[in-house]
Amino acid sequence: CCSVDPAAARRLEKNIAATCGCPYEFIAYDNRINGDGLCKVFNRCAAAARYDMLCFVHEDVEFQTEGWGQIIAAKLAEADCGVIGFAGSILKLKRLTGWHNGGGDLRAHYVQYMRGGHHPIDRNPDGVDFSPVVTLDGMCLFVRREVWSETLFDEQTFPRFHGYDIDFTLAVACRYRNYVCNKVFIEHFSTGGYTREWIRTMKRLHRKWHDRLPMFAMPMPQSEIDRYERISESYFIRFMWQKGCFFERGFGHGMQYIARYPLSGASWILLPKYVVYKLRDILKQKKK
C-alpha cells in the first residue's frame, strides 16, 4: 500500500494477518516525504514483491471476510482473469465520467464509511460470485504479476493520485476480463476527493482512451448505450454539483439537459438538486 499514515498501515497489516488465510507479503511504501504518484508507487512495489499475485490497496481499508486470500487467488488463477476489485462498471462511455455512470452499470460489494455510519453497497443483479466489469475503483485491486507486467501503471500520463485505477483496468480489459468480487466484504473509510485536479485527470484519461471508447464488459445494443449516455450526462451534472464543482458543470449545463430531454425524470430532478447543492455550497463557503 501507499502510506502517509504509519498507524493506518499497521492496522491494515494486522487486519490482513488475521483474515487473509494464505501466505502473503505486506509492502508499505512510506510516501510522507516524497509524495510520489500512485502509478510510480504501485509499479515499484509490484516489481519488488516476491509473490505472483499482487494486491494494490489503500491503507484505509479493512477486510471483513476470513479466508479472502484463497477466494481471490482461485479466481486470479483463471487464464482470462484480469483485475479483481470491489466496485466497478460494466461500461465506460466516451462521455466524461468517473469509474461508473450513475445507473444500472454499477457493480459493487463493499461497505462505505461516511458521515459517521457504515453503509453496505451491494450491486449484484445477476447474483454471481464475480461480476464482469470494465472499470474498477482503486480502493483495492488484485492482479497476477504477469498481467501487471504486460500493462504497468501509466506514470507519465497519471503522475499524481487520480485516474490510475480507471486507466489500468481499461488497459487490462483490452486483453482480459475484470471482475467485482461478491464473495469478500471490505470496508473503505474514505470517499475520495473531487477537485480541479481530479477533473483535469479525468479529461486526460478520456483523451488517452478516446479512440477505444466506449468499452463494455458484455455486448450491448445501441438503444441501451444511448440510454446510458442520457443517464450518465445527468448523473455527472448532479455529481459535480454535489461535490461543489460548479465551475465544471454549472446551472447552464442543467438547463441544456432539460431542454433536450424535457419529459425525462432525470430532467425533473435537476432543478431541485441544483438548489440544494448550491445552498449547501454557499453555507460551506461562509463557514470558511
Label for each model-derived stretch:
Residues 1, 5-20:
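Short, well-formed alpha-helical segments that are part of the catalytic scaffolds
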Residues 33-49:
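Glycine-rich, basic loop-to-helix element that forms the pyrophosphate-binding segment
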Residues 54:
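Short aromatic/hydrophobic "clamp" motif used to bind/position activated sugar donors
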Residues 62, 66-107:
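Conserved donor NDP-sugar-binding/catalytic core segment of glycosyltransferases
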Residues 119-143:
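A recurrent flexible, glycine/aromatic-enriched loop bordering the glycosyltransferase active site
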Residues 135-136, 145, 149-171, 178-187:
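Donor nucleotide-sugar recognition loop
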Residues 175, 179-225:
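Active-site donor/metal-binding and catalytic loop motifs
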Residues 200-203, 224-288:
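Non-catalytic, C-terminal membrane-associated alpha-helical segments of glycosyltransferases
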